[in-house]
Amino acid sequence: MYDLLVRGGQLVREGGVEQADLGVVEERIVEIAPELMGDAREELDARGLHVFPGAVDIHVHFNEPGRTDWEGIRTGSRALVAGGGTVFADMPLNSTPPVLDRTTFEAKQQAAERESYADFALWGGLTPRNLDRLPELAEAGAVGFKAFMSHSGLEEFESPDDFTLYEGMLQARDLGLIVALHAESDAITRGLSTRIRREGGTGVRDYLRSRPAIAEVEAVNRALLLAEETGAKLHLVHLSTGRAVTLAAEARARGVDVSIETCPHYLCFTGEDMERLGAVLKCAPPLRDASEVDALWQAIRAGHIDTIGSDHSPSTLDLKERADFFEVWGGIAGVQSTLTVLLTEGRERGLSLPDIARLSARTPAGHFGLAGKGRLEPGADADLVLVDLDREWVHTPEDLHTRWKFSPYLGRTFRGRVVQTRLRGQTVYAEGRFPHPPQGRFLRPAPAS
C-alpha cells in the first residue's frame, strides 16, 4: 500500500516532462509509472498541474537565533514552502552570535529543528578569528564555509585577508567542504564609498557608483586563483556581471572546482529600478544595467550558472528607512519568489521546465551533497511542488508569509503559481494554508565522492 499516490500530474524530470502517477511509501518516492495500481492511504489528483521537485535554496539569511525581529526561521521557512521550496541552507552571519564554532552551530540547529517548515542545512563562517574552529564546524555538519571579500555589514563577522582565505581554503579542501565567497573587492568598494560620501553623496546613484562591476570582477579573479592554487571547492554567490561569470566558467573549463550562483533580483531588476523603488532593492553587489541582465540570462542558457539562490536577507523597517542610502540595510526579501521568477521570466527567456527544475532543485541538492533531495526519482525524498503553470496572478502583500510584508516583487504579474508543497510526502503548504506544525529536519552533507 502506498502512503501517498499522486495521480496524473505532469512530472518535471531530468529527461523531460511526462504525465504519470507517483507513489510514495515512508516519505520516499518508490514508483513512477503511467498508471499505478494499488491502494493508498491518501490519493492526490494532480491532473492539470505540473509536479516539480521541491526547490533547494542554498542561500538564505533567516537571522535566528538573535535577530528574529528581522525574520526568523519560522516565518522564513513558511515563505520558502509557500514559494515551492522544501530545503534551505542558512548563512552564518546574521544570527547573534554568528555561527563560528560548534556551540553557535548547534544553537542554530536546535532553533531550526523547533521552527522550520522545511528541511535545512547550515553554513559555518570563515573569518580571521575562527580558522581553528573549521574542523569542529565540519564535524557538526556544516554544508560549507561562508566568507566575505568585502565588509559584511556586521562588525562581528569580519572579512578574511588573503592569507586567512588561503589558509581557510586549504582546510576546507582537506575537510571536503565548499567555500562560498561574497566576491567584491574591499579596497575598491571601501575607497569609492569613502570618497563619494566625503563629497556629500547619499543617494541611490551614489551607492551604485561605489560598487562598480570591476569590484566584483577583480575579487572573482582573485578567488579563482586561490581556489586553483589550493584545490579548494569554490562557490561564488550572487554574481551580478557577465564578465565575472565568464571568468568562472573559463576557470572551470581548465579544472578549477567552482560553482556559480546568481539571484532572481539580478535577473529581474536594474539599477534604474533601484532608483525608482529605493531601499527594497538595495543589495550588494548592487543591481546592474539591462545589458548585464541579458548577459546573466545568456549564461544560464549556456549552462554556466549552476544555481539560483534567493539571498533572502530582510531587516526591520527602520533599517530600510534611512535618509542616507549608504546606511540602509542591504538585503532583499525574495525567498518566496525564486521559483515563481523562474517560471515566469525563465520561460520568457527560453528556459525549459527541466532547466528550471535543474537550477532550482537538482543541481543545488547534488552539488552540496543533500542526499535524496532535488529530483523526482524512485529512492528520492517525496519533496513535491504542484504548480498551475497557466495561472496568472499579481503579487500582493497578502500573499507574503515573511515577517515583514515588503518585497520588490509586489505589484508584479506572474504566470505560474504554486498550489501545494509537500515535504517528504506531507503537505506543508496548500493554497495559503500551513496544515501541519513545523517538521523540518537537519541535513548533513553527504561525504564528497
Swiss-Prot record:
- To which pathway does this protein belong? Nitrogen metabolism; (S)-allantoin degradation; allantoate from (S)-allantoin: step 1/1
Enzyme class comes to hydrolase
Query: Which one GO biological process term can you cite for this protein?
Result: allantoin catabolic process
Q: Which reaction does it catalyse?
A: (S)-allantoin + H2O = allantoate + H(+)
Which Gene Ontology molecular-function terms are recorded?
A: allantoinase activity; cobalt ion binding; zinc ion binding
Q: Which domain of life is it from?
A: Bacteria
Q: Where does Zn(2+) 1 bind?
A: H59, H61, K146, D311
What EC number is given for this enzyme?
A: 3.5.2.5
**UniProt remark on cofactor binding:** Binds 2 Zn(2+) ions per subunit.
Keyword Hydrolase found: yes
| Protein family according to the UniProt entry | Belongs to the metallo-dependent hydrolases superfamily. Allantoinase family.
HAMAP family for the chain: Hydantoinase (MF_01645)
Q: What is this protein called?
A: Allantoinase
**Organism, as annotated:** Deinococcus geothermalis (strain DSM 11300 / CIP 105573 / AG-3a)
- Lineage of the native species? Bacteria, Thermotogati, Deinococcota, Deinococci, Deinococcales
